[in-house]
């Protein structure tokens, strides 16, 4: 999986190239300027907009090992085990560099300590921060990516230099990207004269996952026709437009919440990208 397999998101791809890919492909240039190879990027935005897919494609671009970390890989009921699990995951990444270490729903592991009542949760966050800082072992060659739908729940210490020092907003795909995603989703399927530009205009605010659902709904309906006819029936623009009418974009609820944080809790301008996207 590489960037060519992901429709749109060109600005985000360029950011990742500068921060992650080029340091791996041009190490001498970056070292000449004293820029370390590795570091952290936090991607946030509505669910279903390609954060996890982008992380996997990043690993594919640099031909690095991809290590995906979920909540269940870390959390343990016994005191001290969660911290040990986290340390072992970082050690695994360090021993197999170049490695992309990807934390999905990172806010679940790095929630704000101000909201915590239990000491164990604070200890895990302290361990996480120490691992990102490379206190006992160097993280050179380890690329740390985090994804979250709720960056406002993440402890602010994670955004300090050397940790997730680049925070990137992953918005719903724009018109051009939606057309590209629909082309990817219908690739290899029986189709007939599909007007992707028309479909892109009709799917404003749809996430990548929403667009996949559009194609899935259209295919399910077309399969019913094919089963009756006994032969495959090609998908048409009309089929996909009809499927669009049956679905609603799932991003609107997220933006309703994000808008409040962007307007009233935007310390340091971290959510300026949301304000710009919403044209506020």
Language-model region placement:
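Walker A/P-loop NTP-binding motif of AAA+ ATPase domains
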Residues: 1-202, 206, 218
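C-terminal engagement/docking regions of AAA+ P-loop ATPases
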Residues: 1-37, 41, 53-54, 145, ...
